[in-house]
Amino acid sequence: MRHDGVTLGAAIVLAIALMAAAVRVQAARDRAYPSGGDEEATVYVTSPAAARRMSLAYSTLAADVYWIRSLQYYGGTKRRLESERPQLAPPPALAADPSAGYPLLYPLLDLTTSLDPLFNVAYRFGAIFLAEPYPGGPGRPDLAIALLEKGLRQRPDKWEYMLDIGFVHYWFTHDSRAAADSFEKASHVTGAPWWLQSLAATTLAQGGDRRSSRQMWVAIRQSAEIDWLKQEADRRLAQLLALDEIDRLQHVVDTVAERAGQRPTDWPSLIRVGVIPGVPLDPAGRPYEIASEGTVRLSRTSPLWPPPEEPQAVAARPPA
């Protein structure tokens, strides 16, 4: 009997070691031979229930494998699509199916979180990936919210997921009222930080005001449990700073155009008349551009491109 127990224990250890080795080998292979888009055209198992049955006691390890594939798929697809610029418009298929550019992303994330329903990083990262507009993501805030709500069904006390749902509503569906409602709901969870209440009030009162956007990203950064999310919040805050600078520079360009009777189309002409000291750089260190019609904008080569689409102000609530 003891012999059987030892044999079974050894078999389990061997199985875990082999699966871990397979993950390492696959990761090394992907680094050496980056995959193309066609290779990722199928998901290993399409049914979360089937995946759980196949993984048996190793569902958490299997979730790690699917999470790695999710990251590889998202990163590889994003690099491929962004390398196809300057065709910045989404493909026609996106008009009918907004996830056409990343068709496997949600299925992979759904499998990952079904195998490990407490996979916090997969919910929070995955929601950002899903909500990102094309070509940086599939532009599916509805699926981002669905993923976070799936996490909330497992952990109703996870105020961070409610915060993220509000964030998706604010930035991607441009529904400031729904965002404020999510922040308000999160603020009532035991252990939630005090600033959620003020964030809800600010969002409801100011709507699309850039200051409330900045406050929101500061809140996301404060709640981030991993460095990547903090870095993403820093990038978004830099984008907001760039929008402030673009407004200021646009005022300079418009003033010069009014005085000179024609719009400047480059920075040297503004430097010569002494209205700016040099070529203005965005927070990432790339020069801003002046379009032919005199509009100041971010360079498409900047890490801050594309600039965020700012939410609109909240409409007044109709009387009861």
Annotate the PLM regions.
Residues 118-120, 158, 192-193, 210, ...:
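Residue-level recognition of tetratricopeptide repeat
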Residues 177, 185, 197, 202-210, ...:
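Soluble catalytic domains of enzymes that build or remodel membrane lipids, polysaccharides, and related
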Residues 7-24:
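Hydrophobic membrane-insertion alpha-helices, especially the h-region
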Residues 115, 154-155, 188-189, 222-225:
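Structural marker of alpha-solenoid helical repeat scaffolds
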